[in-house]
From Swiss-Prot:
The record marks 72 as: Transition state stabilizer. The record marks 86 as: Increases basicity of active site His. The active site is at 47 (proton acceptor). One of its GO terms (molecular function) is aldehyde-lyase activity. Aldolase which can catalyze in vitro the aldolisation reaction between hydroxypyruvate (HPA) or pyruvate (PA) and D-glyceraldehyde (D-GA). The condensation of pyruvate and D-glyceraldehyde produces 2-dehydro-3-deoxy-L-galactonate. Has weak activity with hydroxypyruvate and D-glyceraldehyde. A divalent metal cation binds at residues 148, 174. This is Hydroxypyruvate/pyruvate aldolase. Belongs to the HpcH/HpaI aldolase family. Keywords: Lyase, Metal-binding, Pyruvate. It comes from Parvibaculum lavamentivorans (strain DS-1 / DSM 13023 / NCIMB 13966). GO terms for cellular component: cytoplasm.
């Protein structure tokens, strides 16, 4: 396995990193995107369709290419956080964080004592990194609470200021709904724009990276706003857009139309 580059060190150096958001189960999709130049992949166990075994295989596929695999867990719960880290995830994104106490619980779940309360038992990752994993995990694993609720937005300074939090990820869909807007990127709407500025400013004050679920159209704006961890596609979106482009091109060249 090629050694994965530390995302935390890249963020600390001011680098912008681009990733692919994986929602479909199985290692093949990860293998397909892992040689394209992405800086990381995210395995989405919250809204994606994979179980734990499939997520483990996806992490392993990323490992083979030396691509950092981050997992969005279904919930901020110590059991599943520990399991995805034991599988080899190099970062954990936790959804629906409400308070600084929630974020502190996430840090505790991701860090071995004396920093946190993670249980030691890296069954799979131990075969990858050997006995030294226990001494490097606290420094290598990225802890990323999501800012996507009104409560988290109100407490963003306290959340990102916590020792052990490495980045905050803006969830534009849930955040928009929390602000009374339709789900999605609502740039140009004052409430949404102000929320983005608030999160970015808080992360800068505390020296933390700021992340976001995005797409190829909006990503350049997010770079300009100061985001450093930006997803530019999901596997489902990439499959749909590429399939549609191929189908449209063939129909245009052959003069055929959609059935029905």
């Amino acid at each position: 396995m090629a050694e994965a580059v530390s995302l935390k060190s890249r963020w600390a150096a001011g680098e912008v990193t681009f990733g692919a958001w994986c929602m479909m189960p199985g290692a093949l999709g990860v293998e397909a995107v892992s040689s394209l130049g992405f800086d990381w992949i995210l395995v989405d166990m919250q809204h994606g369709c994979m179980d734990y075994g499939q997520a483990l295989d996806m992490i392993r596929a990323a490992d083979i290419r030396g691509l950092p695999a981050i997992v969005r867990v279904p919930w901020n719960e110590p059991g599943i956080v520990g399991r995805v880290l034991d599988a080899g995830a190099l970062g954990v994104v936790a959804p629906m964080i409400q308070t600084a106490d929630d974020a502190r619980s996430l840090v505790d779940s991701c860090r071995y004592p004396p920093v946190g309360r993670r249980s030691f038992g890296p069954v799979r990752v131990g075969t990858r990194d050997g006995a030294g994993y226990a001494f490097t995990a606290n420094d290598r694993v990225a802890v990323v609470p999501m800012i996507e609720t009104r409560s988290a937005l109100d407490q963003v300074d306290e959340i990102v200021g916590l020792p052990g939090v490495d980045a905050a990820l803006v969830g534009p869909f849930d955040l928009s709904v929390a602000l009374g807007l339709p789900p999605g990127d609502n740039d140009g709407k004052p409430a949404f724009d102000d929320a983005i500025k608030t999160v970015v400013a808080a992360c800068r004050r505390h020296g933390k990276a700021v992340a976001v679920l995005s797409n190829a159209i909006v990503a350049p704006l997010r770079v300009a706003q100061g985001f450093q961890m930006i997803s530019v596609t999901t596997d489902i979106a990439a499959l749909s857009s590429a399939s549609m482009a191929s189908l449209t091109a063939v129909k245009e060249k052959t003069g055929t139309k959609n059935a029905g």
